[in-house]
């Protein structure tokens, strides 16, 4: 198969050695997409990826991890009839983005994982361009803030940058875009990290990177073009409350003072707040 023909179909830009690209693209990848009530967007996102895998015959799979009760499940199941590498798993109710991804990781067959959002805010060709970076790293984050023309809403960017400063100062994670929904990971590090993560809200991104760094994994960021989706769900109050409480609880959990925190207070967080 001519890799250049495949790349031309997906508008992929090559800046690396052709043989190296062939090697990594023919590895087994699991693309994991959490979907909470995404019936309006899931077809456009999935169609491009499914046709790419179908045309290239790469040994990749796609796992859609569904929460919610709209028509997403029916849409995915209908597409599964055409694309045998498309898989589906569903949780009970809304269990949080982190839990949705963990469910998919548990059943994934890949040697590498690609996490993507259902909104297609980062084009699939950007993901494909980043794939070779995983050869010499353990996590590749597709980072949104370095490219000036990326139009990120002020409130979202303000919260993200403030949260990032707190993460850097409290956990020592020197990453600019911890909350990017687009990541490429080596399977061994992802599984080992998820085995010890209990957070299920969007703070799972930070917990995942923290655990992988503790395991000795190498994390890099690759700036990409980002297109903000006007229908993207973002509640500034919920985000600040959820992320702030999660960061505080996570920091305390990994401090020498954890054993002195009353059990009732620990249980309150896990019962009430980790799904925010």
Predicted features, each with a name:
Residues 91-107, 112, 124-202, 229-245:
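Acceptor/aglycone-binding surface of glycosyltransferases and processive sugar-polymer synthases
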